[in-house]
Amino acid sequence: MRRCRWSAGESGNRKRLTVTGKIKKKEREEAMETETTGENSRIMEKQRAFFESGKTFDLAFRRAALVRLERAVAAHEKEICEALYQDLGKSETEGYMCEVGLTLGEIREMRKKLRRWSRTKRVGAGLANFPAKGYIVQEPYGVALIMSPWNYPFMLTIEPLAGAIAAGNCCVIKPSAYSPATSAVIARLIREIFPEGYVTVIEGGRKENAELLEQKFDYIFFTGSVSVGKLVMQKAAAHLTPVSLELGGKSPCIVDRTAKISLAARRIVFGKFLNCGQTCVAPDYVLVEECVKDEFLKELIRWTKKMYGSALENPDYGRIVNRKHFERIKGLIDSRHLVWGGEVKEETLQIAPAILYPVSETDACMQEEIFGPILPVLPVKNMEEARAFVKSRPHPLACYVFTASKKTERMFLKETAFGGGCVNDTIMHLTPSGLPFGGVGSSGMGAYHGKKSFETFSHAKSVLKKSTLLDVTARYQPYTGWKRRLIRAIGNR
């Protein structure tokens, strides 16, 4: 490539302008991009070859892989918890309770029930096909991409991976760049137990995400923001790749006059301020009946004090993931409505639990998912007003109702759309492996956990096996009178 140099004459005032350095920089960037693209293509080729070898179709192979994964997670527990502390300030107790322990339970569930879930299911073939047998065969998609977030960086990476392995897929894992310590531990752990062609980890940021999404995967499982989820779906559409999108939204919490107010406040405080509010299913705001609002606020503050004390000095209270999110969350604390907490510690990126009241739907904290330790409380006259408020907004990932009234319970469970939730608790619906977890509408699509994870990463292949001993001629032309009568008689059976 020809190098160019422009310069002014001796009497000119223009400074010398060289483009040589710019050209070299561009050449280096293009070379690196080509190298990365080539590396991704090489990994995809290895994964395709591994899948085509048929090894992952063997249930014994899958079960052995789950055993290795379970043992590796247990063996690296301390290292994982240390990484979670580096990335998010999570205490060892919270790291185990919310990430390592739940992950081990999920892997164990899959290991024990894999054979049962994988069985070919017999279904009726209908009178029109007599004699015949119908089957549903679960088969893996092929090569799956798992893109995980930073807020629960270990659990939200390894739990989907376990489902993909159980279903017989090969996997490329892309952890979040915002949790580098945990991403590094995951990469080392995976390299220790699996060959690159079977499961591999690609670390990096947006550039690596974009390059991976150009590849043709057989399934994409994404957990993250709505905006990035839309981009993932757009890229997947180019290859008609099926996707699961685990997104977010403003999850409401409703407290009516019949609720046990103190217990409701305690459980809301737990679900909201766990992981500094950086939980996709955390209660985003509370709608409380006016007749119990004073008692509720009193109990809310009491339990926040009791559970967290001086939060910024509490070793079990973490921090905000990075400066960008810290500044965003800090900007949502409106001093006009602050009734408790909200202290900040700039050097450690910590924000103490903040309770805002009274809040209206036009306030800044109600315009976006908070994803931080701020709890807005909005008074409502009755449950009909609360229901109308929830229904007027995009479908949330979760919804929580505190009530002793069957009428209120039925109202919210049957008349409002949300991904999942609890009656008289918060966030705990994530813990049973028998309950699928996922969103609806703008909060996501698809679900996982337990058997649902296996089904998510499996294609249900329908097979009809027909007998050759008998061939009913009524379906063949020409359609005479008796054939038409017979078709009408058995056509809907």
For the regions a language model picked out, list residue spans one by one:
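Conserved C-terminal "lid"/linker of ANL adenylate-forming enzymes
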Residues: 3-27
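Structural signal for hydrophobic packing residues in well-ordered secondary-structure cores
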Residues: 55, 70-73, 77, 88, ...
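Short, well-ordered beta-strand elements within core beta-sheets of diverse protein domains
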Residues: 49-55, 146, 253-255, 285-290, ...
